[in-house]
């Protein structure tokens, strides 16, 4: 049986439950860069929303919530630094976990008028979220709006997958406990498309210098 993988939480959890059994082996973070496949109902805009695309994803495992949050913050900072190094005008926003589940997540959006997602933010505070999360914000009418292209997403999954798949570790007291999990993804193919949407003119593409194939074309 051969399956196309849209995402790999279950696959990684299955590997970890066979290989990790002690708190001494944690925390640990696995990552990969490979092709993903998703049954998009309406694939469009080239590699912006395709059924096949290149993605970097990673999955971290932890003994407790503080350990998970520490790694989550590191990944948030790392993703921000990656997008800054590329030269993208982006914003990290609070997001809904959706079908993946868990307790908290952030999306990273390249700002572009052609973006599929509506984002809202406050000019007075550091609040920023996608419009779905901001539905019940007390000052929603005062929030500014913009559009973005999602190029990254990070999640605190907690024990959603480990409990369902019985992925456990033995703690300091010799008792079995479910692993806590985080997952983190960057759409490698979509970054290129988003950079084009954000930076171009009537003559064509103006790539940020960090990802431009050439500095000068004659």
Language-model segments: residues:
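TRNA-recognition modules of translation machinery and tRNA-sensing kinases, especially anticodon-binding
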Residues: 1-218
């Amino acid at each position: 049986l051969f399956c196309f993988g849209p995402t790999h939480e279950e696959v990684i959890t299955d590997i970890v439950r066979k290989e990790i059994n002690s708190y001494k082996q944690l925390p640990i973070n696995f990552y990969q860069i490979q092709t993903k496949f998703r049954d998009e109902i309406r694939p469009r805009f080239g590699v912006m929303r395709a059924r096949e695309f290149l993605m970097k994803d990673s999955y971290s495992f932890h003994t407790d919530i503080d350990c998970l949050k520490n790694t989550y913050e590191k990944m948030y900072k790392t993703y921000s630094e990656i997008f800054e190094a590329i030269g993208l005008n982006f914003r990290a926003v609070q997001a809904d976990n959706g079908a993946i589940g868990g307790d908290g997540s952030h999306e990273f959006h390249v700002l572009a008028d052609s973006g599929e997602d509506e984002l809202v933010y406050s000019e007075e505070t550091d609040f920023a979220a996608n419009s779905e999360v901001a539905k019940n914000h007390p000052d929603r009418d005062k929030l500014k709006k913009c559009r973005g292209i999602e190029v990254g997403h990070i999640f605190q999954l907690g024990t959603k997958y480990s409990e369902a798949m019985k992925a456990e570790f033995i703690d300091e007291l010799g008792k079995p406990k479910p692993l806590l999990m985080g997952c983190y993804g960057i759409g490698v193919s979509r970054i290129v498309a988003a950079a084009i949407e954000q930076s171009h003119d009537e003559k064509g593409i103006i790539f940020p210098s960090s990802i431009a194939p050439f500095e000068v074309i004659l």
